Curated annotation (Swiss-Prot):
Pfam families from the UniProt entry: HTH_3
GO terms assigned for molecular function: DNA binding; DNA-binding transcription factor activity
Highest taxon of the lineage: Archaea
PROSITE patterns xrefs: HTH_CROC1 (PS50943)
Domain HTH cro/C1-type residues, every copy: 132-186
Keyword Endoplasmic reticulum assigned: no
DNA-binding region coordinates: 143-162
Name used for this protein in its record: Putative HTH-type transcriptional regulatory protein PTO0557
């Protein structure tokens, strides 16, 4: 029984029911991620793992680059780790990427954000520091009084009021003493992705294509182990690129088209060999010789717009 595949299908169905536009499961060429979904301004790049301990650092640079460029959030959905099943309502991390159980994620997209996370040393509660300070002052408690009552340092109280998290046992004492819920929801959409290591582009043709697009004024990000090869973009336009060295794989082009529809990007096929086809499955096709002859970004955009099918 393929538990991971079953979980992907289960997640796909749940996202559809919750109003998301979702890329289809089982699309050709998926390795780095499993699903991409969008609902209004919410965009998630999802990796599904049965055991989260198998999450490798190898795909992180591509995930982070993709999230940064498309303004999406990365989330790993898992069932278990080496220490047991993932607990519902708890946020986990691997390599700075947030991880949740299926139920926790469904609760999250329905407005119930987790406020407890797992980290070295146990579970921690995210505290609303401003609220804690306000309630302490309303009750007339000094920092010294509260620290003495809880048996912790004054510095710890100051840290909590500055937004630091507390262990569950300390948090429960705080809540009991102040008589208020002090938890603060954790919004994974606020995660910042710092990826300093870019994947080397080993394919000479792909590297040459990006260099030519860069010469026209486009920025780019290479994405490995996905149906598309990366993104090329300026402030107004973003292309999802499929770069084909020889023959064009129909299944891969269909995958690029469907994923681009979710992210609202323009799917663009760059072909090494000249072809009379200007559009395949709704994706504009440009040969490398045509790209090489482009004298400006404006001319290139006009060529792509002419060949782009919006249906």
């Amino acid at each position: 029984m393929d538990y991971r595949h079953d979980l992907i299908i289960k997640l796909y169905d749940a996202l559809i029911k919750n109003g998301f536009n979702v890329s289809e499961p089982d699309l050709y060429g998926l390795v780095t991620f499993d699903l991409i979904c969008r609902r209004n301004d919410e965009k998630y790049i999802i990796k599904v793992l049965y055991n989260i301990d198998t999450f490798s650092r190898l795909s992180i640079s591509s995930l982070m680059a993709m999230a940064s460029v498309t303004k999406s959030s990365i989330i790993v959905i898992g069932e278990k780790s080496g220490s047991g099943r993932l607990e519902d309502g708890i946020l986990y991390y691997r390599h700075h990427i947030p991880i949740m159980s299926f139920k926790t994620f469904i609760d999250y997209i329905n407005g119930e954000s987790p406020y407890i996370y797992s980290a070295p040393g146990g579970y921690y509660v995210s505290i609303d520091g401003d609220k804690m300070r306000r309630i302490r002052e309303l009750k007339g408690y000094s920092v010294g009084y509260l620290s003495s009552k809880l048996g912790i340092s004054r510095r710890s109280i100051s840290l909590y009021e500055s937004g630091s998290s507390a262990t569950i046992d300390i948090y429960l004492k705080l809540e009991e003493t102040l008589g208020e819920d002090l938890t603060k929801d954790i919004d994974i959409r606020n995660e910042k992705y710092d990826y300093n290591i870019k994947d080397d582009i080993k394919d000479v043709f792909i590297r040459e294509t990006f260099q030519m697009l860069s010469a026209l004024g486009y920025s780019y990000e290479y994405i490995k182990k996905s149906p598309f090869d990366g993104f090329s973009y300026d402030p107004e336009t973003m292309f999802m690129l499929g770069i084909f060295n020889n023959y064009m794989e129909n299944e891969r082009i269909i995958s690029i088209k469907k994923i681009s529809q979710v992210l609202n990007n323009i799917p663009l096929i760059i072909q090494k060999e000249y072809t009379e086809k200007e559009n395949i499955y709704g994706c504009p096709v440009v040969s490398i010789s045509e790209l090489r002859s482009m004298g400006s970004m404006y001319a290139f955009k006009k060529l792509v717009e002419k060949r782009y099918s919006y249906d």
